[in-house]
């Protein structure tokens, strides 16, 4: 079995060595320009077109939960990967736990009004504030995939009313499920904290705009953990300035790194992190990929395959 690996920043030698330990019968190599030798599987992130074009691969693994970058390249270069070759994404590999940590900590931060207390501290004001109640602090999750399910699960223990919005109905315990555009308003109008975990598709680009934000309760919060292109940044800032939104926590941006001139840097009710909510953890990724390859070699059914038409 031949496996090729490409990532523009990862330590290729570490990955090659770890994969060979996990799959003793495999020969693994870092792909370099000019390497046209046969391969059975490819592990990639932002691969050059020539790496995959014309290869008779059994499968390709994208080294992340999001596959929008490789799908965008496939749209521009359909010859890059034959439609018959399955493309897999990393389903969890530790990302679920990271998303849980991030989402729970931020929801609690807002619920306990730590943002307000920080503002008071900056003014040297000692002023206890009225508490929020859990009943008025409904959390809505846009996107009900693997990561959305993990986040909902982690929030259940805290007693917040939970709801999710997705393209198909979910039957998660203790979570109200809303489906499609026709139920979006009903989902939004009782959502105090909006968590975005949608996939990046043509249908979701720019979805968090003024029309959507206007349907949230006054004083709502937005937590974006998915993709920067989901948010119309000017509309978000306008909602913050008007008081429609009380705060926003952003991990992803339309342009990364975020330009220094962006007003998001200076807005007092915007907090941000540099796209670190859930990063690929190599050891767990190796475990998932090696198990999946072993299952494929045995002809067993596997999960994590990308539906190219849907975009996730």
Swiss-Prot record:
Record localization: Cytoplasm
GO molecular function ontology, one term from the record: glyoxylate reductase (NADPH) activity
Catalytic residues, chain numbering: 227, 275 (proton donor)
GO-annotated cellular components: cytoplasm
UniProt entry keywords in alphabetical sequence: Cytoplasm, NAD, NADP, Oxidoreductase
Catalytic activities: glycolate + NADP(+) = glyoxylate + NADPH + H(+); (R)-glycerate + NAD(+) = 3-hydroxypyruvate + NADH + H(+); (R)-glycerate + NADP(+) = 3-hydroxypyruvate + NADPH + H(+)
Major location category of this protein: cytoplasm
EC numbers on record: 1.1.1.79, 1.1.1.81
Superkingdom classification of source: Bacteria
InterPro entries reported for this sequence: D-isomer_DH_NAD-bd, GhrA_Enterobacterales, NAD(P)-bd_dom_sf
Family, per entry: Belongs to the D-isomer specific 2-hydroxyacid dehydrogenase family. GhrA subfamily.
Role according to the record: Catalyzes the NADPH-dependent reduction of glyoxylate and hydroxypyruvate into glycolate and glycerate, respectively.
NCBIfam families: PRK15469.1
Name under which the protein is recorded: Glyoxylate/hydroxypyruvate reductase A
């Amino acid at each position: 079995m031949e496996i090729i690996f490409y990532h523009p920043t990862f330590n290729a030698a570490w990955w090659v060595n770890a994969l060979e330990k996990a799959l003793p019968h495999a020969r693994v190599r870092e792909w370099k320009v000019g390497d046209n030798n046969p391969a059975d599987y490819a592990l990639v992130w932002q691969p050059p077109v020539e790496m995959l074009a014309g290869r008779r691969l059994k499968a390709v693994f994208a080294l992340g939960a999001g596959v929008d970058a490789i799908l965008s390249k496939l749209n521009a270069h359909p010859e890059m990967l034959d439609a018959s070759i399955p493309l897999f994404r990393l389903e969890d590999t530790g990302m679920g736990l990271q998303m849980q940590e991030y989402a729970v900590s931020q929801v609690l931060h807002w619920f306990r009004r730590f943002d307000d207390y920080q503002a008071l501290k900056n003014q040297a004001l000692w002023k206890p504030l009225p508490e929020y109640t859990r009943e008025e602090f409904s959390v809505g999750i846009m996107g009900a995939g693997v990561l959305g399910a993990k986040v909902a699960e982690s929030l259940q223990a805290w007693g917040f009313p939970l709801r999710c919005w997705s393209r198909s109905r979910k039957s998660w315990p203790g979570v109200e499920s809303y489906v499609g555009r026709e139920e979006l308003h009903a989902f939004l109008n009782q959502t105090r904290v909006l968590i975005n975990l949608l996939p990046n598709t043509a249908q979701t680009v720019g979805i968090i705009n003024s029309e959507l934000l206007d349907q949230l309760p006054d004083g709502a919060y937005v937590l974006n953990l998915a993709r920067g292109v989901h948010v119309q940044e000017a509309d978000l800032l306008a909602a913050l300035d008007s008081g429609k939104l009380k705060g926003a926590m952003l991990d992803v941006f339309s342009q990364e790194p975020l330009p220094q001139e962006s007003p998001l840097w200076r807005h007092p009710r915007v907090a941000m992190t540099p796209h670190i909510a859930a990063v690929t953890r190599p050891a767990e990724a190796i475990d998932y990929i090696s198990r999946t390859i072993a299952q494929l070699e045995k002809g067993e059914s596997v999960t994590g395959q990308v539906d190219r038409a849907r975009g996730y």
